[in-house]
Amino acid sequence: MPSAKSTPDTPWPVRDVNNQVKNWIERLGHLWVEGQLAQINVKPNWKLSYLTLRDVEQEVSVQLTCPTEIIRNRPTPLKDGDRVIVYGKPAFYAGRGSFSLWVTDIRPVGIGQLLARIEELRRQLAAEGLFDPARKKRLPFLPKCVGLITGRGSAAERDVLSVARDRWPEVQFKVINTAVQGASAVPEIIAALGELDQDPGVDVIIIARGGGSVEDLLPFSEEALQRAVAAAQTPVVSAIGHEPDTPILDNVADLRAATPTDAAKRVVPDVNEERLLIRQLRDRGAAALRGWVAREQQALASIRTRPVLADPMTPIVRRREEVERAVSLLRRDVNHMLRTEQSLVASLRAQVSALGPSATLARGYSVVQVVPRDGTPPQVVTTIEQTPPGSQLRIRVADGAITAAAMNTQKSD
């Protein structure tokens, strides 16, 4: 084991590096590891067999080395895509710098266990809100381009393409073929989903597979795929086509279709149905317009038959006669009022004249005023004491005034 620190001046040789790695790996001890089998390489005359164990969610794998008799003695043969749990010890071969897992036991993951894990994951994702209808995106009415993820040359691909093009011949497809079962299915589907989701020309994505066994459909319940679908900006349709067992993808996708054919029908409208609908709407619109025109014509005819429009001058003449009568009555009332008021004024004038000083003077009476010598206004004489002899007097009669002087005064008895 090297004691010096690795530096540019004192680098470690490859053998020392490999020995260090080997020592560290050997300290890990025995491990239980779960994954999916792939690339099973078994020869009857070999003592050792070589397999690849892949992660169920990511593109990660590890090489397995195990005695051939372990595989030969199994009650059912192993095949690619089997979910298994292996027991082994990590081993690093320093001579060629390779890592593998030395396996001494291989156990299949039971269907019951797998279904229990799926249901547990289903509950977890539901609690996180991934199944919430509020987060599901609406599909476009008429997609210009449909993304399709499915197996190469599969019946699902043929069904979707043929049904969709029969319904709407102008629809375009961007098809990405992936594995739809086995260890590589999930990473390939996620990669295809990401590519289609990033394409601005793709309006909706269909993930399709034409059914299969529970084991075959396991990739469509893997957590990584569910989170990728939930994060996609483009609407995703699940078309797995397996009614008894519902993959989690059916819950997370924006729309679940029973089969690939059903997906094509629900994603792409039928041109014949749309043409029929357009004709029906056009006929309904024309009927509604004709009905409206008929009602308006009837209303106009009703208005035209009214007397005021049949003889428009008669109401005017009638109103003019009413105005003339009103003017005549008003003139008569005004004249009557004027005569009444004139008579009242004449009567009041006569009363004023009869009661005024002029009428009294006309009957021979007079008003005697003494004219003070200091120029002050004349004073009406009411007593002889106001007119001592020599006082200048002003005597007012009916038709004028007389100036006189007081000669003497005589007190009445």
From Swiss-Prot:
One of the Pfam families matching this protein, by short name: tRNA_anti_2
Entry GO CC: cytoplasm; exodeoxyribonuclease VII complex
Residue ranges the record marks as coiled coil: none
Gene Ontology molecular function: exodeoxyribonuclease VII activity; nucleic acid binding
UniProt xrefs under InterPro entries: Exonuc_VII_L, Exonuc_VII_lsu_C, OB-fold_nuc-bd_dom
BP GO annotations: DNA catabolic process
Keywords assigned: Cytoplasm, Exonuclease, Hydrolase, Nuclease
Entry EC number(s): 3.1.11.6
Compartment list: Cytoplasm
Role of this protein: Bidirectionally degrades single-stranded DNA into large acid-insoluble oligonucleotides, which are then degraded further into small acid-soluble oligonucleotides.
Subunit comment: Heterooligomer composed of large and small subunits.
Family from the record: Belongs to the XseA family.
Name of the protein: Exodeoxyribonuclease 7 large subunit
Organism expressing this protein natively: Corynebacterium efficiens (strain DSM 44549 / YS-314 / AJ 12310 / JCM 11189 / NBRC 100395)
